[in-house]
Amino acid sequence: MIDDILKDTLAPALKRLAFKRRGLCWNRRRGAFVDVISIQKARFSTQEEEHIKGYVAVCVPEFREIIFGPSPPFFTEADGIFSFRFTELEMNDLSGRVLDTWWKIRKENSKSIACDLQRLIAHKAVPFFDSCSSFIEAERLVCCKEGGLSTPPIFN
C-alpha cells in the first residue's frame, strides 16, 4: 500500500519539484542547502495495515563537512541541522512539543492518505523549505526547535 502511494503519488510529485529519490527518502539541492523528505515505515506494519510517519529536514553540506568530514552522496533527516515531523508541520507547531502521529494505511483509506500526504508536502513542506532560504532563517528554525534563543544570533 505505502509502496503504491510512493510510486504513484509522491514520487512523481516530488520529481516535478526537482527531488531525487533513494528508497524512502528524497533530496533536493537548493543553494547551500539540501532539502530532505523522509518516510519511515513502522516495524509493526502488517499486510493489512501499514504505519508510516514522515520528516522534513534541511542539511548544510558545508557544515557537515567541517564537523564530520565528506558529505554523503544522499542525505537523510538525521543529517539535517534540524528536522521536523510531518505532524509538527501539519499543526504549525515547530516547538518539539507535538506528539508524533503514525498514519495507518489500509486498502480502503490508501487513496485518502495519498491525497493527505501530497497536500501536506505541497502546502506545508515546500513552503517550509522555501521559508528557509538563508542562514538567518535556518537559525530561527533551529531556535524554534530548541525552545527559543539561549544565545545571541550567530548570523545577523
Regions flagged by a language model, labelled:
Residues M1-T9, R21, R28-N156:
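Intrinsically disordered, low-complexity regulatory regions enriched in serine/threonine/proline
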Residues L14:
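Pyridoxal 5′-phosphate
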